[in-house]
Amino acid sequence: MWKFIKSATDQNNWLEHDQNEIVFWGRSNVGKSSLINALASQKIAKTSSTPGRTRLINYFETQRKKIIVDLPGYGFASMSKKAQSKISGIIDFYFRNSKNSKNICILIDAKIGFSYIDLEMIDYLKSLGLLFDIIITKIDKANQSQKHRVKQQALTFSDDINIFMVSSEKKQGLSDLVEHFEL
């Protein structure tokens, strides 16, 4: 059984542990929390139709004792510049200073594809020397052409990244994530 462990506002209350972290990050409203709930088969992460609701670093533990980190989304439209700046600073500090090794998963909405800000965040991760995988979400809401386009975009990044296509709502592709990350 998965469980919520804690929320952290900054490095002073990060979860202290010695495990690899599986980090979910993407644009606001891309489905990070919904994906966690679908993988857990229970509602342990708060979801909202309003973008930018996750403003803390949230830690979860899988039944196999893996640590999942739900980061606040980027591209928050309904948030003040001050709040955006604070969250960006927390995330930057986390990526630069957290001692735990990380499997970073960039989540991309299948209908929207890679936006300019997604590409900026990928460049940012590369500039830090961090590796990442791509999880294409909401595939049940995209048509065949949109799914093909976003997958082709994802394939341009590198041969070493894993690409997953999932639907939290229809439970599609979840077993691939469970198997790959040993959740």
UniProtKB/Swiss-Prot annotation:
Any single Pfam family the record assigns to this protein: MMR_HSR1
Coiled coil regions in record: none
Statement: the UniProt record of this protein carries the keyword Cell division: yes
PROSITE patterns: G_ENGB
Cofactor(s) required for function per UniProt: Mg(2+)
Positions bound to Mg(2+): 33, 54
Gene3D superfamilies registered for this protein in UniProt: P-loop containing nucleotide triphosphate hydrolases (3.40.50.300)
GO biological process, one term: division septum assembly
InterPro entries xref list: G_ENGB_dom, GTP-bd, GTP-bd_ribosome_bio_YsxC, P-loop_NTPase
Domain EngB-type G per the UniProt entry, residue ranges: 18-183
MF (Gene Ontology): GTP binding; metal ion binding
Residues binding GTP: 26-33, 52-56, 70-73, 137-140, 166-168
Record's keyword terms, sorted: Cell cycle, Cell division, GTP-binding, Magnesium, Metal-binding, Nucleotide-binding, Septation
Signal peptide (residue range): none
Family: Belongs to the TRAFAC class TrmE-Era-EngA-EngB-Septin-like GTPase superfamily. EngB GTPase family.
Role of this protein: Necessary for normal cell division and for the maintenance of normal septation.
Listed name of the protein: Probable GTP-binding protein EngB
Gene expressing this chain: engB
